[in-house]
């Protein structure tokens, strides 16, 4: 099996490094940009970006979903912000699951309204994620970032129309199960 090294990425599907060269990856914007700089932020020419509410942020004191939504609305006016995310559900870290699910539903709504695909963060919550996907029936593409699950879970997600993005740690059988045009590579670099 020949799996490309992450260090040799031609295109990084998911990174947090703001110094990523334009056209070489999708930079996931941080909460400071979304909450405080959205109205003045300008993308690099030729850059690709994503903006969303990470499930970990739901544990922040004074978490304000409406403030995040206002910031996202401003950022999504830029065509370079081509994805909603990273957003999702994390059973190990973040606010209460009910809050995370409410935020996720709002992010799906935002994605659908803006016509942007979603980058999904999901940790030990694929049952909830699949239920949300079934209930909300999104038309926009969902890509699970940093996928580490097995081939069976990979196939379930693929059958629902989702793509998978693989980082440094992954299950080789899941990689093999995923068609080349439905799998992405990422660094998830800070």
Where are the regions that the model predicts?
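Mid-domain alpha/beta scaffold segments of enzyme catalytic cores
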Residues: 1-190
């Amino acid at each position: 099996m020949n799996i490309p090294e992450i260090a040799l990425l031609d295109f990084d599907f998911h990174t947090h490094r703001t110094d990523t060269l334009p056209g070489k990856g999708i930079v996931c914007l941080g909460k400071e940009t979304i909450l405080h700089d959205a109205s003045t932020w300008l993308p690099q020419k030729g850059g690709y970006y994503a903006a969303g509410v990470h499930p970990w942020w739901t544990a922040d004191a004074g978490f304000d979903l409406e403030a995040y939504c206002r910031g996202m609305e401003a950022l999504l006016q830029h065509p370079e912000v081509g994805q909603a995310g990273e957003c999702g559900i994390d059973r190990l870290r973040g606010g209460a699951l009910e809050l995370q699910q409410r935020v996720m539903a709002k992010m799906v709504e935002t994605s659908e309204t803006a016509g942007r695909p979603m980058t999904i963060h999901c940790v030990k919550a694929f049952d909830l994620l699949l239920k949300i996907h079934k209930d909300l029936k999104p038309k926009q593409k969902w890509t699970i970032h940093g996928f580490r699950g097995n081939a069976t879970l990979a196939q379930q997600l693929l059958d629902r129309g989702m793509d998978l993005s693989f980082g440094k740690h992954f299950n080789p059988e899941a990689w093999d199960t995923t068609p080349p045009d439905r799998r992405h590579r990422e660094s998830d670099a800070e």
